Amino acid sequence: QVIQSLENNEVDFSLVSIMPTTLRVDHMDLLQNKLFLVGNMEREFKHGPYGKSLLSQLPLIFREKGSGTRQVMESFLKKQNVPVIRKLELTSNEAVKQAVRAGLGYSIMPLIGLRNELLNKQLQIIPMKGLPIKTTWRLIWLSGKKHSPVAKAFLSYLKKERARIIENTFRWFEEYE
């Protein structure tokens, strides 16, 4: 859906963790993306890191087909070569997060959207061998696109201020490896 909006020229930019293969795009690397196995606080996971057998015991919640998060999660699960319990498929990271909070299952999710829930002890990171998965958040746009003055100013601002924004806003990322 994100890529389709870009392709249809409905948006100037898209934020992705996996580069599209069907479009010619330019990009700017923004921030490391770390994906962890997360669950609510009902069950304790103190004796990790856990091996792949844990994955076959947990009901898993997936993003929709085409989602970068889903692609990364499925690739990881395929490498683990264990059967999994597919509980739900939802259309946004926020929906997945709320389902996990409600105790409907577990998921492999990007750290970027979990800060408040981790601080408030509504979610926990489950230590797992092979995690976190690390990718890169990238801002992409169609190659050769003629940007509006506002879009040009936005790109210029990001190029100039990227390091400062990361330092001031995402320093907490470093706590999680």
Where are the regions that the model predicts?
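Hydrophobic/proline-rich hinge and linker segments of small-molecule sensing/allosteric domains
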Residues: D26-K65, K134-K146, L158-A163
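Short beta-strand-centered segments that line the small-molecule binding cleft or hinge
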Residues: Q1-L35, G39, K46-P49, R101-L104, ...
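Well-formed, non-transmembrane alpha-helical positions, independent of function
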Residues: Q4-S5, D29, S53-L54, F76, ...
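Secondary-structure junction motif
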Residues: F45-K46, P59-Q80, H147-A151, L155-S156, ...
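Thr-Gly-centered strand-to-loop micro-motif
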Residues: F62-E64, R86, M109
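Short helix-initiation/N-cap motifs at beta->coil->alpha
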Residues: Q1-I3, E89-V96
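Short beta-strand-to-loop elements that line the ligand-binding cleft
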Residues: S17-I18, P83-S92
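Short secondary-structure boundary segments
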Residues: I18-M19, M41, L111-G113, K129-G130, ...
